[in-house]
Amino acid sequence: MSQTLKTAIAVLGIDIGKNSFHVVGLDQRGAIVLRQKLSRGQVEARLANMPPCLIGMEACVGAHHLSPTADQLDLQALHRVRERLVSQRTGIINQIRAFLLERGVAVRQGLRFLRAELPRILATPPDVLSPRMVRVIEGLAGDWRRLDERIEGLSSEIEAVARQDTACERLMSVPGIGPIISSAMVAAIGTGDVFSKGRDFAAWLGLVPKQISTGDRTILGKISKRGNRYLRVLFVQAAWVVLIKPKSWERHGLKPWIEAAKKRLHRNVLAIALANKLARIAWSVLARGRDFEVRKIDEAAAQPA
């Protein structure tokens, strides 16, 4: 069955396989007007020659090249590699701390403190750290340095891309958002038009509470933590950056909102609420194509979302 000039496809469904794709088109009444089997290389050419319609496909690895642009996929690849390297570095640092603590050597929390103290610790007498353990930790420290170099290189490349992208530049006008978050957001959702409002974007990130309904009551629980974990973590980090700089609250128009929220929320809950707010602001900036504009919020209306 194939499409004719008298039939317009309203909805197109694509079943994605490794080498072949099955395409089914429906008209406005739901009747099948197209059914084809295409190779992977034929799909894009076939879609390019069709009138605009609603396209549905399964969410899988094979579908990624059909939706985001090539630039988005490249940027996502940079972020994924960087995320993996950061995770590996964290694992190495935790392992070094664990080995030291097993021998009674405690180091103040924080990456820079361990980096500064490690040479002195490794020079301690053999009764504290055996020569074998010193060699083990020196090897881990070497892995740490190599990961630092790779992470720094990827971060510099991501920042360079963000500085040349108009959408990323706009997003960086939002408090707490820099090149990493802005580029990760653009890579993930493009222009943001896949969401109808900022609340939907925040929900997709998993920054909204779960709702438990019983009878006529609705109970709000912990955040759902669904969706894009990487972006969610970045927005929470952005919220903490804003919270530890109270002098910037007034400049960004967030002071009334934060001060009202502080009175009734634990600081960790406040960080999540602010991350939700920043995500919604960021979506608005991206979707509307305008820089962040400071708008003071009345204390009476400062309800964390």
Show the residue positions of the predicted features.
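A detector of single, family-specific signature residues
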Residues: M1-A305
